[in-house]
Amino acid sequence: MKHKILLVEDDKDIQEIIEYNFSKEGYEVTKCSDGESAIDLVRHETPDLVILDWMLPNLSGSEILRQIRSSKKLKKIPVIMLTARTEESDKLRAFDTGADDYITKPFSNSELIARTKALLRRVSEDSFTDTLNFHDIELNRDNKRV
């Protein structure tokens, strides 16, 4: 299954580079370049992961992140901030708002892909449950009890 990545980046050159590299790795990439489009896409397409620039037209990346984290449906989507903001205070603010990772520009495509794979792997592992339920029967896989 292809993972769906939402790339929110207003620099078209960076968009193209990321889309090219992620497509080569088997990801499906949807791109947008402003905050309002990002909110619309994340709500209607529910990506597996969001790569989010901070400084965007219409709505900042931190505000988009805040809206994602405040939505019951969307709050578990992993978000990687990809931004030119390099100050420690910016990084801390992003993590406090709910970013899962933070990468500063200029960046390595290989590192961005590796961090994406790691986040998606962790999210996939967390989605498995220790119990299986069927009608009134519950099987606990950890302690092997019914």
Regions found by a protein language model. Name each.
Residues E9:
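Conserved acidic carboxylate
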Residues Q15, P57, K75, E87, ...:
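The feature encodes the CheY-like receiver
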Residues H3-K4, A118-V146:
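Short, Lys/Arg-enriched segments at the junction into DNA-binding effector domains
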Residues G26-D34, L41:
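Short hydrophobic/Thr-rich beta-strand motif most characteristic of the beta2 strand and flanking loop
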